[in-house]
Amino acid sequence: GKRHRRKPNRMSDAEIIVILIHFHSGGFRCFKHYYLHYICKHCKHLFPKTVSYNRFVELEKEVLLQMTAFIKQVLLGECTGISFVDSTPLRVCRNQRILIHRTFEGLASRGKCSMGWFFGFKLHLIINDKGEILNFVFTTGGVDDREPLKEGVLLKNIKGKLFGDKGYIGKTLFESLFIDGIQLFTKVKNNMKNSLMSIADKICLRKRALIETVNDELKNIAQIEHSRHRSFCNFIANALSAIATYCFFEKKPAIDLEFINDGQLSLFEKLYRTHVILDIFYFSFNNS
């Protein structure tokens, strides 16, 4: 058969990942300008074996698995019992260019968010009250916000109370999450009856805008969203490196909360114990 050269890359996977992550933290907006005029000129002592820009773009897709494992295993935060969930659109082109768009043809789809219709993908996030990302997943733009929660993709190591917007309203979803030890709180629609909740839960629900701040930092401080991608792999590499950059931020948006035991969960324990005692009494009474 035809022989292929298996020459190792000049740049290591770690060097490629570091360059991708540093791009989002340096305030740059054009990766080509950043790589050619900053990395290749001013950081030659840190990366002595730099390759051409075209070759570096080709190498990005080879570190996707390593970068994903690095984020999932090292950079994600820990659940504190109070979590916030939301999705944000990642547009790949303007709405006027949807019909002539070719880069993500067959991959991206139309979706609708609070800002209107868009064409692209969705980033689903779960964060804690410290602003740390607990988990994330990418879907096409037309996927319902509740689907990742129904499938359990986002809920690994999540427990306690979960706060979301009106897009997560659903009786079946609430019941399935409650069985798994997660209590879902959402704002009610105008035609719905108001639900009873404690003052602490109402305050946390008002603080749900915390995750909107995280989305804003991912898009404006980092550059997770732009329309200059030329392949799906490089789109994912850019998005993952933006998430990794955010995880390295020393100061994240956070809220100060004090845990208050409102006795909601103990109420279910008391009802269960009462039910068990009544069953025992009924069984002993019939046997006598």
Task: Give the predicted meaning of each segment.
Residues 1-288:
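Short alpha-helical elements
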